[in-house]
Each structure stands twice: as C-alpha cells, then as structure tokens.
Regions:
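Hydrophobic cores of alpha-helical transmembrane segments in multi-pass inner/ER membrane proteins
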Residues: 2-3, 100-107, 151-163, 188-199, ...
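Membrane-interface coil-to-helix junctions
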Residues: 40-96, 101
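Membrane-interface micro-motifs in multi-pass membrane enzymes
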Residues: 55, 70-74, 94, 98, ...
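Membrane-embedded alpha-helical segments of integral membrane proteins
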Residues: 205-272
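Internal/C-terminal transmembrane anchor helices
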Residues: 276-300
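Membrane-interface segments at or immediately adjacent to transmembrane helices
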Residues: 296-370
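Single conserved hydrophobic/aromatic residue that forms the stacking wall/gate
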Residues: 377-384
Length: 384
C-alpha cells in the first residue's frame, strides 16, 4: 500500500495575464515615449521656434494688457499661452513645456477612449494619433502654444460631458457652456462638433441639441450685449490661422479630425475583435514612426541657420553674423540682409559683400518690412 507521500498533487499551471496591470504599464510606457520624443525633437531640432515666438510678442504684467485679452472670448486662452511662452528664451524650458502639453493631451484623449469604448483594443492608438498630429502642427513657427491648449480644453470639457452622471449633472455641464465659450473661444465649436457626433452615435440627440441651443443663445448675447465682437472673432478666434500654412486644407483637416474623433472610435469598434487585436498591436508603433519621419522630413537646416543669424543680429554680434553667413552661404533674402547690415556696421560692405551669396540686389541691403515678413513666412517655415 502506497503512502500519502507517493501521491502527487497536480501542479498549477502558470499563466501570463494581460490584465489591467499590463495595460497600465503599457500606457505609462507610451506616455514616456511621447514626452521623450517631443522633448528631444524640440530641444535639438526645432528650438528655433522658441526664439521666434518669444521675440514675437511682449508680455506685460499689467491690468491694461490683461484687459485686452479678457475683453473677448478666447482671449484668456491666448493670454495663458503668451504667459507660458515667456520662458522660451531657455530651450530646455520650451522643450519641457511642449512635451508636457503633448503628454497631457494623450492622457486626456486616452481617458476619452476608455469612456467611449471601454475595453477597446484601440484605446491607445487614437490617443497617440491625436498627440502626434498636434506635435507635427507645432513644427510650424506660427502655430502657438495656446492652439494646443485649446484642443486640450476641448478634450477636457468633452470628457466631462460624456462622463457617467445623472440628468442634473448633464444639465449642469450644458449650463456651463457660456463659461467654456468665454475661456476657449472658437475651440467651443470643436467641442460642439465632438459632442454632436458622440450624441448621434449614442442616440442621445437631445443632449447634443441642448448644447446647440445654449451655444446659440450665448453667441447672440456675446455678440450683442457683452463683448460686441465681430462675427469673425466669435466664430474663429483664437484658432490657428490658415494663412500661415502653404496648404490651408491642413487646418480644416485638423479640425475635422477632432470633431469626428468620437465617431472614429465608435466605427473602429465595429471591427471583429480578433482582427482589431492584431491590427492594434503595432498601430501605436506605426504612428510614432510616421510622426518621426514627417517631423524630420519637415525639418530644414536653412531655418536653423536663419534664426541663428537673427539671434546674433539682434544681439548686435556683427562678427558672428558675418562669419556664420560666410561659412553656411545661406541663400535666404533675410539672411543676406542680416549679413549686409552687419558688414555695413563693421565698415566692410564694399570690400567683403561678395564673400557670401548676393541673390537679391538692393533688396538684400534695404528690405521693406512687408517683404521681409513675407520672405520669412515663405522660406520653408510652414508645413507643406
């Protein structure tokens, strides 16, 4: 008779679980990649954007300066962007700020994904896409910080609007729209588009219609009573201007992407789960790779050279401007203008001006301001 010691107990099989813990780790890894990528790109490649935008505006700590922004819807959003942009004289600060904003955007839209489509395989894909698209937009020197803050605010308000809550909670959220309109300006229309699309797919048209009723009343009151702003300001300010982009359709495609963002999430959920799981596995990596390729494709060394020249020119470093232009031979009109003025300041214009390119005749010696501005805008500073 065999003893109890001879009886072998069945061993438990070890299984690798892919539960909430692994998803949480995956999420934090993606956030770390977004932050690191943005910090690296804007610190080492697109840091000239910080110099340009910091010099473009003068922030003044005064009630008069603040009142100029507080007197119109969306003004405080631009004011906040201007305030934060004053630290752009330090490239590390600028890169850290941009990276933080992009990471916050990804976090907010990830939360939206989890509410709209809980358990979806694409919960990270669309959040990374939203952050990456705005990262690409920021490579334009005239695309400012408050533009990304506006999309962030629209996402936060939408997140609050679709959060689980009773009838009273939703009425309260709808009633807060005038305040949101005052803070975010025309980014309210992005939010209205998002909430309308979500209401349509979820068959909650009354909820979306309520926002449009409040929006219409708010618009009339702001136009006729409170702010007396022109329709163009109420309907578009402070959205990014299309004039700063070679292909103006890029801006409208950006707006449409965020407006139909909830619809994209819901449509993707109709895929077969086994197929979507396979597709979603590498989708985040593909988005990151595409973003990196497009940012480096849009990068121009001529832009870097031009703004380094401008930085030395504003610092009255005439020798530095002369040496840099003669070394790099930049053919941009503004670069040649800085070079010739520096030669004139050193008394060497007649003897040394042909040591560097002179492609524009007298234009590179005395350039009208409007031509100087248009030249800078057209010298590959814009997303093509």
């Amino acid at each position: 008779m065999k003893g109890h010691s001879d009886i072998q107990k069945p061993r438990r099989k070890k299984t690798v679980r892919s539960g909430p813990g692994s998803e949480r780790i995956y999420k934090y890894v993606v956030f770390a990649v977004i932050f690191t990528l943005a910090f690296f790109v804007f610190l080492f490649f697109y840091n000239y954007i910080f110099f340009y935008q910091e010099k473009r505006m003068l922030f003044v700590f005064s009630g008069e300066y603040l009142s100029g922004f507080a007197s119109k819807p969306g003004g405080l959003l631009e004011y906040a962007g201007n305030f934060l942009s004053q630290g752009y004289f330090n490239n590390i600060y600028g890169a850290f700020l941009q990276a933080s904003v992009f990471t916050l955007i990804a976090a907010v839209f990830l939360r939206i994904n989890n509410l709209v489509l809980p358990g979806s395989n694409f919960f990270l894909f669309f959040a990374v896409m939203a952050s990456s698209i705005l990262m690409l937009m920021q490579t334009n020197i005239n695309y400012r910080l408050h533009n990304n803050l506006g999309f962030l605010l629209a996402g936060v308000y939408f997140l609050i609007g679709v959060s689980t809550g009773g009838k009273i909670f939703r009425i309260l959220v709808t009633a807060l729209f005038p305040l949101f309109f005052y803070l975010a300006g025309a980014y309210s229309w992005i939010f209205l588009g998002m909430i309308t699309v979500w209401s349509f797919f979820n068959r909650k048209l009354v909820f979306g219609f309520g926002f449009w009723v409040v929006a219409g009343i708010t618009l009339l009151l702001y136009k006729s009573v409170l702010f007396l702003q022109p329709w163009s300001e109420l309907l578009y300010y402070p959205l990014p201007l299309t004039d700063y982009f070679i292909h103006r359709s890029i801006i409208w495609l950006l707006f449409l992407f965020f407006i139909f963002y909830p619809g994209l999430l819901i449509l993707v959920s109709s895929f077969r789960r086994d197929y979507s799981r396979k597709f979603a596995t590498g989708s985040v990596i593909v988005v990151f790779l595409l973003a990196i390729i497009m940012m480096f494709k849009a990068f121009s060394s001529d832009n870097v050279q031009l703004f380094r020249l401008e930085k030395m020119f504003f610092a009255r470093d005439w020798d530095g401007v002369i040496e840099y232009q003669e070394t790099h031979q930049n053919r941009n009109l503004v670069a040649q203008y800085y070079y010739n003025i520096s030669l004139a300041e050193k008394g060497m214009l007649s003897s040394r001006m042909f040591f560097a390119p002179q492609d524009y005749g007298t234009m590179s010696v005395m350039i009208p301001w409007r031509d100087r501005k248009s030249t800078r805008l057209n010298s590959s500073h814009r997303i093509r």
